Amino acid sequence: MEPIPPSNGNKNNSMDKQPQQPQQPQQQQQQQQQQRRDQRNSKLNELNETERVRNRFISHEFHKLDRTKSRIDAPKISFSDSESESDSEFFLAKRNTNNNNQNNTSPTFSSANGKQSNLTQRKINTQIQSKQPTNNNVQPLTDDEGTINHSNHHHHHHNQNNNGNNNNNNNNNNNNNKISTPPKQEEKMTMNGLFTLRPSILSSESNGSSYRGFLNLLLILLITASFRLVILNHLLYGIRINLDLYKISEYHRWPGVMISLMINLFIIAAYLIEKAAAKQLLPDRICYLLRIINCAAVIIVPSGSIIAFSPNPASGIIVMILICTFSMKIISYAYENSKQRKLNPDNKKFVIDPTNTSIYPNNLSLRSTYWFMLVPTLVYQLSYPRSPKIRKGYLLRRIVEALSLSLLILWMVNQYMLPLVQNSIEPLEKIDIVLIVERIMKLSLPNLYVWLLGFYVFFHLYLNIVAEITRFGDREFYRDWWNSTGLDYFWRTWNMPVHHWMVVLIYTPMRRRGFSKNMGYFMCFFVSAIFHELVISIPFHSLKLWGFFGIMSQMVLIALTKNLMNGRNLGNVIFWISIVLGQPLVVLLYYRNFVLENPEWYRNVEPPTSPPVMPFY
C-alpha cells in the first residue's frame, strides 16, 4: 500500500500538467508580443527624448544671439542656460542603442563641470503643446559653474542649520558694514554740496549721458542736405522716371505671373506626398524619392521658365525671390512631417482626437498647408503662436505706409540710381580708377537710401501686414543688426526667418551627425550663396558667380575680424563702410554686365549727360 500514494501523486501531477501543455505556445507568443511592444516603446522613447533635446539645442542656438559680443553695448556677463547646454551635449553625443528604457532618466555629461547628470524624460507632445518661452534673465554664471552650484547648495543647508544667535550676529555685522561704508562720492563732496569729483559730460569717463540732441541735429542736417540735392537734381534733369523698364514684355502671357502661379503645383504635390505617406499608400523609399524630386523641381522648373520666357529683370527678381521662399517652405514642410511620422508610426492620435490640427496627421489638410505657405516664416511646425484678432486700423496704416514708401523707392531708383549707373559705363570700360571711385561714392548715398527703405518696407511693413492678416503671433523678423560690430551678428539678425531655417534644417542636422561647428557654418553660407546667386543671375541671364563668391567670402572676413572688433565701436564703423561702399560696386558691376549682354533693353534710352560742374554751397 505504500507505493500507492506516490502513484496517485504522479497521476495528479500529470493531470495538472496536461492543461498547461497547450498554453506553452500561447505564453511564448504573448512574451514575444510583449518584447516587441517593449522594443517599440523603447525606440519611441528614444525618439521622443531626441526630439526634446533637439528642441532644447535649437533654442540654445537661438538664444546665443542675446549673449553675443559682436554688437555695440554687448553684455559683459554671459547669461547661459545650463540645462540647454547639457542637453546639447546629450544631443551631440553618440548614445548606446541598447539602453535600458525602464528608467525615466538618461545619462548625459554636463558641459559645465564634466560630471554626469540626469535629464528627466518628458513626453514630446507635452513640450509641443505647452512649450514655455525660455527666460534669458537667469543668474549670471561664471566659467566655474559647478563651483557656484556647489556653493549655493552648501549655503542653503548652512542657513537651515544656523541658530538664532548666528542670524543675529550676521545681521549686526551686515548693519555695521552698511554704516561704516558710505558712498565714495559723499566723502569728496564739499559742505555745501556744490563741488565733487565728476568728469565732463562729453568725457569718456562720464556715464549715463544722453546724446539724443546731437542725434536730432544730425538728422536735421541730413534731411536738409538731402533735400538740397533733390532740388538740384530736379533743376538739372527734371523728372526722369522711365516706365519702359517696368512694362510687361508679353501682355498675352504675363510670364512673371504665370511662373508665380506655377508654384501652386509643387505645393499641392508636397501635400499629396505627405498625405500618401501618412496613410501608408506608398512605401517610405518612394515617398522619400518623391520629396527629393519635388524639392528640386520647385527650383529648376520656374528658373528654366524665366530663362525661356525672359521677363524683364524687375519681374524676374521678384519671381526668383518667391521661388526661393516657397522652396524653403516646401523643404521644411516635408522634413517636419517626415519626423512626426516617425514619432507616431501607427497614427493613433488621429483616432483619439481627429479635430485637433496641432497633432500629426490631423495637420495634413490643404487649408493648413496653404496657411503655412502664406505666414511669414520658413520653418514648419504643428502649431504657432496666434494673435487674438486682426487689428484693422493697424493693418490699414501699414498698407498705406508700404505703398507710399514703395513709390518713393521707385522714384529714387529712376531719378538717381539709373542715371548714375548709366554714366558709369564709360569709366568702367576705360578702367579709370579715379572716376570709378567717384561714381561709387556718388552712388553710395541713393543706394543706401533705397536699401534701407527696401529693408523697412519688406521686413517691417510687408511681413507685418502678412502676419496681421494670418494672425501670426511671432513678429521678430529682424533684430538690431545696425549695432553689429562684426559680419557674423549681421548675417544672423538682419533676416531672422532665413536664420531660423538655416539653424533648424541645416546646422542642427549636421551637428547631430557629428560635423563640427565650422562645417555647419560653412554649409549654411554655401546654401545661402546658392540662393543669392540664383536671385541675381537667373533674371539677368548672366552666371558670373559674383554673388556666390561674395557670400562665401563673408566667412573669411568673419574669421579675421570676429575676435578683434567684438563690442567695439570701430567694428560698427567698419561694418557700415563695407555696406555703404561695397553695395554700389556690386550694383555697377552687374549693371555693366547686363547692358553689355542685353543692349536691346536700353536701345531707345538715351544715356543722361553729365551735369555741369557747380560750386558746393
Swiss-Prot record:
Biased composition (Low complexity): 18-34, 96-105, 160-177
Matching Pfam families: MBOAT
PANTHER family linked: DIACYLGLYCEROL O-ACYLTRANSFERASE 1, STEROL O-ACYLTRANSFERASE
Region named Disordered: 1-52, 95-186
Protein known as: Diacylglycerol O-acyltransferase 1
Transmembrane segments: 217-237, 254-274, 306-326, 399-419, 449-469, 520-540, 545-565, 570-590
Cell compartment(s), UniProt: Endoplasmic reticulum membrane
Biased composition (Polar residues): 7-17, 106-140
Catalytic activity: an acyl-CoA + a 1,2-diacyl-sn-glycerol = a triacyl-sn-glycerol + CoA; all-trans-retinol + an acyl-CoA = an all-trans-retinyl ester + CoA; 2-(9Z-octadecenoyl)-glycerol + (9Z)-octadecenoyl-CoA = 1,2-di-(9Z-octadecenoyl)-sn-glycerol + CoA; 1,2-di-(9Z-octadecenoyl)-sn-glycerol + (9Z)-octadecenoyl-CoA = 1,2,3-tri-(9Z-octadecenoyl)-glycerol + CoA
Membrane disposition: Multi-pass membrane protein
Keyword vocabulary terms for this entry: Acyltransferase, Endoplasmic reticulum, Glycerol metabolism, Lipid biosynthesis, Lipid metabolism, Membrane, Transferase, Transmembrane, Transmembrane helix
The gene coding this protein: dgat1
Role of this protein: Catalyzes the terminal and only committed step in triacylglycerol synthesis by using diacylglycerol and fatty acyl CoA as substrates.
A biological-process GO annotation: ether lipid biosynthetic process
InterPro entries per record: MBOAT_fam, Oat_ACAT_DAG_ARE
A cellular component annotation (GO) from this entry: endoplasmic reticulum membrane
Lineage: superkingdom: Eukaryota
Motif (FYXDWWN motif): 477-483
Family membership noted in the UniProt record: Belongs to the membrane-bound acyltransferase family. Sterol o-acyltransferase subfamily.
Organism: Dictyostelium discoideum (Social amoeba)
Recorded metabolic or biological pathway in which this protein acts: Lipid metabolism; glycerolipid metabolism
Enzyme Commission number(s) of this protein: 2.3.1.20, 2.3.1.76
Class of enzymatic activity (EC top level): transferase
